[in-house]
């Protein structure tokens, strides 16, 4: 999973993700927008569900983040289906509306985002 952080002329940080992970970039750009407290909440949730059967979800204005002990899923709220309806090999997939990745990979992006934010 490749990513890039950019700062626009107003100083706002934008995240660009590799193909198949665009929704993760959109989540950072639309939901996080520099809100490090939200990232604290996500990191705490990842620690809480690690090694358990539990999952956690955070619905935002445009995107919802789900995570369990192994995987993170970010989907556009406009898709309107629940996590239970996603099946192996599902036929509906839109790279910009749905992204899946491992928890550790996601937390690496979160850490890199924090680091980039501090380089003002």
From Swiss-Prot:
**What InterPro entries would the database entry show?**
UPF0231
Tell me the leader sequence span: none
Could you name the domain of life of the organism this protein comes from? Answer: Bacteria
Q: Which family does it belong to?
A: Belongs to the UPF0231 family.
**What protein name does the entry list?**
UPF0231 protein KPN78578_01240
């Amino acid at each position: 999973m490749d990513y890039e952080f950019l700062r626009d002329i107003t100083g706002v940080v934008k995240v660009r993700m590799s193909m198949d992970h665009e929704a993760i970039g959109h989540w950072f750009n639309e939901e996080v927008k520099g809100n490090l407290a939200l990232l604290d909440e996500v990191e705490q949730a990842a620690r809480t569900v690690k090694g358990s059967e539990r999952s956690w979800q955070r619905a935002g204005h445009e995107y919802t983040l789900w995570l369990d002990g192994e995987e993170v899923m970010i989907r556009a709220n406009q898709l309107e289906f629940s996590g239970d309806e996603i099946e192996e090999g599902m036929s509906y997939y839109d790279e910009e509306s749905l992204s899946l990745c491992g928890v550790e990979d996601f937390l690496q992006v979160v850490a890199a985002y924090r680091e980039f934010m501090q380089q003002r």
